[in-house]
C-alpha cells in the first residue's frame, strides 16, 4: 500500500503567514490520519525577496504551533535538497526534456515586446496572453540564437480548445476551458524555474501523493495537470482548500488583519488555541465541539467535513477561544507560560539597551517600556491633537505611513524612518509634525524610547496593528478618503 505523503511549500519572503499555517495544518492532519508523512519544502526561487531569516521564521512558527515534519531543509531526508534554489540542475534537466519532446519551447521576447503585445491585445478588447510568436521561428533560427547566448525563457505549449477536467477532492470534477490558459513560462532567464515546473517536478520526485493547497490555485490547475501528462507521470490527488477571509468576506490580507503567525505568538496567544482555531476554519469535529487538541483533530480528521464557504478569520473569536484554553490551564502552568512569554531572554535583550540609560530604578522600566509587552495600546485621543494639522490631515499622515510600511520588505530602523520621511516630504511637512503621532500610536505615550527603535523591535505586524488601532480611535478612514489617499500613495517615492 502506498504511503500517504503530503507537503507544505512556503516561500521565505516575509513573516510566516497564518494562511501557510492553515494549509500546513490540514496537510499534516491528513497525512497523520492516514499513517503517512508530512514534508516541508522551501520555494525560494524568488532570489530578490527570499531570505534565510524568513525561512527560519517559518520553521519557528510551525514548530511553535506543534507542527513537525519528517523531511525538510533543516532535518534532511532521502529526497533532498529541500530548497528549490539548490535544485537548479534538476529543473534544467526536466525543462530540456519538455523541449525535446516538443511540449515546450524557447522564447526570446524582451519585456518591451511583451508589453507591446499586451497593449495591442487590450486595445482590441482581448485577454492579454502570450501569442506564441516564438513557435514561428525555424529550428535553425532558434539554435542560432541559443548558440549566441541570447537571453530566453522556456514556455510550455497549451491547447487552445476544449476543457481540462480537474479532479478536486472537495468539489469533484471541475471543468476549466483551455483558452483561459497562457503559454506559461517554466524557466526564467536567470535559469530558475517558475512555480509550475518546480512544483510538479518536486512533488513527483518527492513522492507526494496528495496536495492540499489554497483554492486560489484552482484556476491554474490545468497547467499542472498538463505538465504531469507531458512527463507521463501519475499526478497526486488534488484538494483545493477554501481561502481564509476577513470578517467583511474579503480575502485575508495584512491591510485588514494581522496575518503573521509571529504576531499572534507575540500577542500572547497559546499555540494550542491557534491550531484549534485554524482547525475550525472550514472544518468541524464530528461532535461539533469548539475546543480540541491537535491530536484530537488528527484522530477525527476527514476531508468530507470541510465546508467550501470562505471561513472567516476573526481575531475576536480567536481571542475568545484562547481564553478558554488559558482558563483551563493549571495555575502553575499558567504562571510558567506567562513567565516564558513575558520574560523571553532574546526579546528582553532587544529592549534593554534602549531602556537602561533612561531609568534610575527597575521600577521605572514598566511605565517607560510596558508597551513592548502589550498587544495594543490605548493612547489618549488628546495625544493626536495637532497645532499645525487638521484631524483629517493627522489621519492622512498616519494612513499613508501605514501603507508605506506595508510595502517594506526589510524591517529595519533606517528603512522604517525612510517610509516616514517619504510621506512627510511628499506632504511638504517636517519630521517633527509626524513623529508625535507615531509616538502616540505605537507607544501610547507622548514620549518614550526612540519610536523607530520601538517599531523595529515590535515588528511589522504589531506596528501596523497599532497604527490601525489609532486610526480607528480617530474615527477611521472613509471610502472617499481611502480612494483619494491611495492615489496620493502612488506618487510617493
From Swiss-Prot:
One cellular-component annotation, GO: cytosol
Alphabetical UniProt keywords: Aminoacyl-tRNA synthetase, ATP-binding, Cytoplasm, Ligase, Nucleotide-binding, Protein biosynthesis
Substrates-to-products reaction catalysed: tRNA(Glu) + L-glutamate + ATP = L-glutamyl-tRNA(Glu) + AMP + diphosphate
Enzyme class: ligase
Motif stretch ('KMSKS' region): 251-255
Keyword check for Glycoprotein: no
Span of the annotated motif 'HIGH' region: 10-20
One example of a Gene Ontology biological process annotation: glutamyl-tRNA aminoacylation
Family matches, as InterPro entries: aa-tRNA-synth_I_cd-bd (IPR045462), aa-tRNA-synth_I_codon-bd_sub2 (IPR020751), aa-tRNA-synth_I_CS (IPR001412), aa_tRNA-synth_I_cd-bd_sf (IPR008925), Glu-tRNA-ligase_bac/mito (IPR004527), Glu/Gln-tRNA-synth (IPR000924), Glu/Gln-tRNA-synth_Ib_cat-dom (IPR020058), GluQ/Sye (IPR049940)
Subcellular location: Cytoplasm
Superkingdom of the organism of origin: Bacteria
GO function terms (MF aspect): ATP binding; glutamate-tRNA ligase activity; tRNA binding; zinc ion binding
Principal location listed in the UniProt entry: cytoplasm
Ligand binding (ATP): 254
Enzyme Commission designation: 6.1.1.17
Family under the similarity heading: Belongs to the class-I aminoacyl-tRNA synthetase family. Glutamate--tRNA ligase type 1 subfamily.
Subunit structure: Monomer.
Known role: Catalyzes the attachment of glutamate to tRNA(Glu) in a two-step reaction: glutamate is first activated by ATP to form Glu-AMP and then transferred to the acceptor end of tRNA(Glu).
HAMAP family for this protein: Glu_tRNA_synth_type1 (MF_00022)
Name assigned to this protein: Glutamate--tRNA ligase
Lineage: Bacteria, Pseudomonadati, Pseudomonadota, Gammaproteobacteria, Pseudomonadales
Amino acid at each position: 500500500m502506498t504511503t500517504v505523503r503530503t507537503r507544505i511549500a512556503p516561500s521565505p519572503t516575509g513573516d510566516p503567514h497564518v494562511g501557510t499555517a492553515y494549509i500546513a495544518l490540514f496537510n499534516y492532519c491528513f497525512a497523520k490520519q492516514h499513517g503517512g508523512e508530512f514534508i516541508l519544502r522551501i520555494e525560494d526561487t524568488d532570489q530578490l525577496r527570499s531570505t534565510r531569516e524568513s525561512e527560519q521564521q517559518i520553521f519557528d512558527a510551525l514548530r511553535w504551533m506543534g507542527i513537525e515534519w519528517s523531511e525538510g531543509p533543516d532535518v534532511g531526508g532521502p529526497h533532498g535538497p529541500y530548497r528549490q534554489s539548490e535544485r537548479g540542475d534538476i529543473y534544467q534537466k526536466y525543462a530540456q526534456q519538455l523541449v525535446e519532446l516538443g511540449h515546450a519551447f524557447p522564447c526570446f521576447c524582451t519585456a518591451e515586446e511583451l508589453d507591446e503585445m499586451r497593449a495591442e491585445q487590450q486595445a482590441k478588447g482581448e485577454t492579454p496572453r502570450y501569442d506564441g510568436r516564438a513557435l514561428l521561428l525555424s529550428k535553425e533560427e532558434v539554435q542560432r540564437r541559443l548558440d549566441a547566448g541570447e537571453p530566453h525563457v522556456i514556455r510550455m505549449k497549451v491547447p487552445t480548445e476544449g476543457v481540462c477536467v480537474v479532479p478536486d477532492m472537495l468539489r469533484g470534477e471541475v471543468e476549466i476551458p483551455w483558452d483561459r490558459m497562457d503559454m506559461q513560462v517554466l524557466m526564467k532567464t536567470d535559469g530558475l524555474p517558475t512555480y509550475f515546473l518546480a512544483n510538479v517536478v518536486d512533488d513527483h520526485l518527492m513522492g507526494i501523493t496528495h496536495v492540499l493547497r489554497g483554492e486560489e490555485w484552482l484556476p491554474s490547475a490545468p497547467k499542472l495537470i498538463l505538465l504531469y501528462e507531458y512527463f507521463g507521470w501519475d499526478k497526486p490527488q488534488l484538494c483545493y482548500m477554501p481561502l481564509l477571509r476577513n470578517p467583511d468576506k474579503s480575502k485575508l490580507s495584512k491591510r485588514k488583519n494581522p496575518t503573521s503567525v509571529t504576531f499572534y505568538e507575540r500577542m500572547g496567544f497559546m499555540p494550542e488555541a491557534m491550531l484549534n482555531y485554524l482547525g475550525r476554519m472550514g472544518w468541524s469535529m464530528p461532535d461539533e465541539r469548539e475546543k480540541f487538541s491537535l491530536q484530537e483533530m488528527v484522530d477525527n480528521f476527514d476531508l468530507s467535513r470541510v465546508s467550501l464557504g470562505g471561513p472567516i478569520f476573526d481575531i475576536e473569536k480567536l481571542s475568545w477561544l484562547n481564553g478558554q484554553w488559558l482558563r483551563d490551564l493549571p495555575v502553575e502552568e499558567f504562571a510558567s507560560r506567562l513567565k516564558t512569554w513575558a520574560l523571553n531572554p532574546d526579546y528582553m535583550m532587544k529592549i534593554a539597551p534602549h531602556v537602561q540609560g533612561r531609568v534610575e530604578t527597575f521600577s521605572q522600566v514598566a511605565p517607560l517600556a510596558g508597551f513592548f509587552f502589550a498587544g495594543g495600546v490605548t493612547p489618549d485621543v488628546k495625544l493626536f491633537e495637532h497645532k499645525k494639522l487638521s484631524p483629517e490631515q493627522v489621519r492622512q499622515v498616519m494612513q499613508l505611513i501605514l501603507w508605506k510600511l506595508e510595502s517594506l520588505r526589510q524591517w529595519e530602523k533606517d528603512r522604517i524612518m525612510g517610509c516616514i520621511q517619504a510621506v512627510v516630504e511628499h506632504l511638504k511637512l517636517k519630521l517633527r509634525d509626524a513623529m508625535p503621532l507615531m509616538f502616540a500610536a505605537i507607544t501610547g505615550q507622548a514620549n518614550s524610547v526612540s519610536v523607530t527603535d520601538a517599531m523595529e523591535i515590535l515588528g511589522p505586524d504589531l506596528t501596523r496593528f497599532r497604527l490601525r488601532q489609532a486610526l480607528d480611535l480617530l474615527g477611521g478612514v472613509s471610502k472617499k478618503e481611502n480612494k483619494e489617499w491611495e492615489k496620493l500613495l502612488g506618487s510617493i517615492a
